[in-house]
């Protein structure tokens, strides 16, 4: 009995301690939110600097229907759609953790967004939503 209590306490303590790595198959989360947003932009889009971000434009909490409040539920401020966006050409040399943040601060004083590479049109698709540029605030 004397051996069981310390062994049980040791095992309980070891199980309660946080792990040092990430779970199998799950990538560890980076501390740099800008770098995370760039990774979320993906291959089918590019980073852009937008003059204006319209947050929750045309979306109200009183909408009724199957898809009501879907866009308003994305992020704390909803989905931000960019207007007047120009593509940012990011050199490979700045892709480090601190280099990317500094590059964006120097080259974009407005809003950073993720824009689709193709022209976005809402005509003829099932949902009828065209979101060419989405602010990083809606992605994080």
Curated annotation (Swiss-Prot):
Pfam families: Hydrophobin
Localization in the cell: Secreted; Secreted, Cell wall
InterPro entries named among the record's database cross-references: Hydrophobin (IPR001338)
tRNA processing found in the keyword field: no
Name of the protein described by the UniProt record: Class I hydrophobin C
One Gene Ontology MF term: structural constituent of cell wall
Description of the deletion phenotype: Affects hydrophobicity only when HfbD, HfbE and HfbF are also deleted. Disruption of all 7 hydrophobins leads to altered germination kinetics, decreased survival under exposure to extreme cold stress and increased mycotoxins patulin and citrinin production.
